[in-house]
Amino acid sequence: MPRLRLSLYGMTLMLLATPAIQAATVRLQLEGLSGELQNNVRLGLASISSDEVSADSRFQARLTDSIKKSLSALGYFQPAITFQTLPESLTTNNNVIKVTVDPGPPVKIAGTTIVLEGEARQDPDYQAWIKKGRPKTGTVLNQGDYDSFKNGFSSLALRNGYFDGEFKKSQLGVSVDRGEAFWDLDYDSGQRYRFGDVIFQGSQIREEYLRRLIPFHQGDKYSSLDLAELNRRLSATGWFSSVVASPDFSKGKASKVLPISTVLTPAVKNTVETGVGYSTDVGPHVKATWKRPWVNDNGQSMSFSTYLSQPEQQLDMSYKVPLLKSPLEQYYLFQAGLKRTDLNDTKSDTSTLAVSRYWENSSGWQKALNLRWRLDHYTQGTVTDTTMLLYPGVSVNRTRSRGGMMPTWGDSQRYSVDVSDTTWGSDIDFVILQAQNVWIRTLAERHRFVLRGNVGWIETNDFDRVPPDLRFFAGGDRSIRGYKYKDVSPRDSDDKLTGASKMATGSVEYQYNFTGNWWGAVFLDSGEAVNDIKQTDIKTGTGVGIRWASPVGPIKLDIARAVGDKDERGLQFYIGLGPEL
């Protein structure tokens, strides 16, 4: 084994000579070890504090015991340890305690006997654990691996319901003279417990709705993962402020069938949330939301929200009706809204009604059939009109993330098709296709990439009567930074924005975590909003920014400028709060 010289500068020891003489500084120097052996010895020595250090033989004995213990855990039982006390230099009163360690020959695995009894013999989780954890003959003994292997049996027992499991034998035999070690384990899992009836207590919701949320059946094999999923599904409804589902061992010990006691606390019937924010796109804004998470014992819920900013004011109402067959994944959503907009060259007053039928599958994809009605009175540029639309649509979307409010991994995808036709009473015919994607990936912990893409297409026989809310405008945050909010679109003869029938934008952003919750960012945004794809008008912006992963969500500040556009020479600043997905 290569002999490396390691100075532990972090351990400074004060040896008191006499009250009249200043204590000398002692530096501990460790030689002869490397890699995992060196790290484990250092970890053991870290428990010795400076005020416990002594220059006598008792300290050396304690040091020797610590080193031997650290090495034996990794299969080295016969180290040779020598000590030398040397002056650090001729000009100082400081000393160096030089500890030289020869780990000696290792003890290697000579054989393993692993016996598994009980119903766990047929459990693939146990079979996989044994296959993964059984050491190969001839490898150096690691007592930590042995302990972890044993603990894995107990962990699997709790997870898979072998609550009577126990080791009939668990021996780690070591022959130091022969340099051999033997694993000898005999584990009897006993009988696997099964799920009994789920008993709900304290619920204000009809029990048939709750039973549709249970992810297992009575008589199924017990799994703590399934029990956790029951807790998650009940919590996800929003009906309860507290959910505690746990097995009742007092009633299932003899039969090996565990009733599940589920104690529920109803959510507060009315909640009000208010918020004040600022974004560069719309300036300061205020939002207030009143929610009733449950209106009746069928689990129906409703909410009212209002949003106020200088360019946009909006009032929305929604009413959710969960379906008995699958209350969490399938439901109807009824919506109504009023909106007023005065932004750039757009002025509009909009009334909307909508009914949607939602499905969500186990992979996270949410599908919806929508039927929308809207009445818009608007002025866009120099055109003033009123349009009534009745249009069905289909949408699918999915959002995934890992890593909290500042995800290290995630993506958001949304695709939709909306169709209007004069056949059923709409003022105009159109087909609108849209796709939005955001992807977040992190490399080597500190390097984070955010990719965005948006595509939209309107096919219509009368574009001037398409309401501004349905037209495409680019520019601003989450679009093309370097341009003002919704300031990129075709213009009319008076140089006023008209909105576009085609849009495509993309963004590449790199973020670096330079300290704690702070990230620096550089980005490039590009895209266009046009009526004729043969006449491209690509706009590009680039810039830098900073991100703070605050307790209430990511807060960002970006500075960007347009590239190669003689009409856009100034800097644009963007301030935002909220999730990236």
Cite the ranges covered by each PLM segment.
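Bacterial N-terminal signal peptides that target proteins for export
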Residues: M1-G10
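Periplasmic polypeptide-binding modules associated with outer-membrane biogenesis and secretion
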Residues: A23-E36, A46-T280, T289, S303-V321, ...
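Flexible, surface-exposed loop regions and adjacent strand-edge segments
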Residues: L116, F200-Q204, T280, D349-A354, ...
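Gram-negative/organellar outer-membrane beta-barrel architecture
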Residues: E119-P124, S223-R414, R441, R478-G482, ...
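Short, contiguous acidic/charged loop-to-helix segments that flank catalytic cores in large enzymes
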Residues: Q218, E273-S279, S305-Y307, G425-I428, ...
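C-terminal outer-membrane beta-barrel translocator/porin domains of Gram-negative envelope proteins
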Residues: A236, H377-D385, L389-F514, V522-S526, ...
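C-terminal structured "cap/appendage" subdomains that terminate the fold
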Residues: G527, N531, Q535-I555, I559, ...
